[in-house]
Amino acid sequence: MKHFNYHQSSEIVFGTGRIAEAGQIVKKFGNRCLMVTTPDKPLQPMYERVKNILTGAGVEVAHFDGVIPNPTMETSAAGANMAEEHGADVILGLGGGSSMDAAKAIAVEATHEGSAWDYLFYKEPAPDPSKVLPVVAVSTTSGTGSQVTQVSVITNTAERDKSALYN
């Protein structure tokens, strides 16, 4: 398979073995990374490999592995707390759409008052783009395309509702 790069508001880095570049890519945005994943045991070796790539590039990593399918406000809050405690200046979403959605919600919630739910689709006030932590997305599945959009879908279990964070 040929390698290629494509840029349209999101840069796409694609090709066999390109995960080795993750550390240098993340380092462009910060030195303290919160890696956001599901807790899946079979994926632990991949998570460790990516952590090693990041630390090899001089990036300090905290691993939030509390993502569930259809991430909830509670997921976002727990991840945002970990990001704040770690002093994260960049978020890495690693996995499928749920990890990506959680990473983007965490990037907002860690830097804004209230919860990610407070910043839903065209709800005021909108998140301040200059405060939102940068998100690097590494997709391990095909599906929603969450890795190339700014949209994050989260679930509010108390209201039994699911909506998009998109502003």
Predicted feature locations:
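ATP/NTP phosphate-donor binding region
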Residues: 1-90
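Glycine/serine-rich anion-binding loops at beta->alpha junctions
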Residues: 88-106, 140-146
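A glycine/threonine-rich phosphate-anchoring loop and its flanking beta-alpha core
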Residues: 20, 111-167
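Low-complexity, flexible helical/coil segments
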Residues: 50, 69-75, 95-101, 126-132
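Fold-independent oxyanion-binding glycine-rich loops
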Residues: 16-17, 37-39, 67, 94-96, ...
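N-terminal loops that bind phosphate or other acidic moieties
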Residues: 85, 106, 123
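Hydrophobic/aromatic beta-strand patches that form the interior of the parallel beta-sheet core
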Residues: 62, 92, 134-138
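Short Gly/Thr/Asp-enriched flexible loops that form oxyanion-binding sites at enzyme active sites
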Residues: 50, 78-80, 99-112, 148-151
